[in-house]
Amino acid sequence: MSEECTHDCSNCGAACSSRDAAPQHDAPNPNSSVKKVIGVVSGKGGVGKSMTSALLACAMARRGYHCGILDADITGPSIPKLFGIHGRAMADDKGCWPIQSRMGIDVMSINLLVENEEDPVVWRGPVIAGAVKQFWTDVVWKDVDFLFVDMPPGTGDVPLTVFQSLPVDGIVVVASPQELVSMIVAKAVNMAEMMKEIGRAHV
């Protein structure tokens, strides 16, 4: 796969692994251009997954890459708070636009769409999964080199939706050194490998 790959095979004649799997993924917003999608996962909560997502984006931004973070943790979003973002995301006829942090990192989170960031999101799994999918299909990710997807812990509806809907190029697994955590992390890694085998991810 070319380093310039945007996962849009409609205007590309190159033969690569991305072309074989691309039809199974949801198309991004027509105005988006995302080169690499990196999932950040963990077996359990409280291990610093969201902080890792933020630090990875900051590190790559300092290297000159344009980065974005898709906050897929719908019921426990923390990315806007980490970047000190309190505004509301805006939308127009092209789609919904992420809010840019002071470092130039594009951020989209459910907390940027609700009136009060402390209001709970009491949605069932399919609705949450649908919202995450819309963060990919409806949000304009403009000229993003690396899009980090901060997922909720575990192997539930949201991680499954991300692997099925987005062209994930790789994952970062965040863990703490406990035996129980290691076992749960193994589940997350095995899930990623399973999705790779059936052509849903490039990890």
Language-model features and meaning:
Residues 1-28:
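Cysteine-cluster motifs in flexible loop/terminal segments that predominantly coordinate metals
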Residues 17, 39-42, 61, 80-87, ...:
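Signal for well-folded cores of large energy- and translation-related assemblies
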Residues 25-32, 136-138:
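A short, basic/flexible loop-to-alpha-helix module at the beginning of a structural domain
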Residues 31, 36-74, 189:
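Walker A/P-loop phosphate-binding motif and the immediately C-terminal alpha-helix
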Residues 34, 45, 71, 79, ...:
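Residue-level signature of catalytic and energy-coupling elements of molecular machines
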Residues 66-67, 72-117, 129:
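Phosphate-binding loop that captures ATP/GTP phosphates
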Residues 114-162, 181:
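Phosphate-binding/switch loop-helix module in NTP-utilizing enzymes
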Residues 145-202:
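Conserved catalytic-core segment of NTP-binding enzymes
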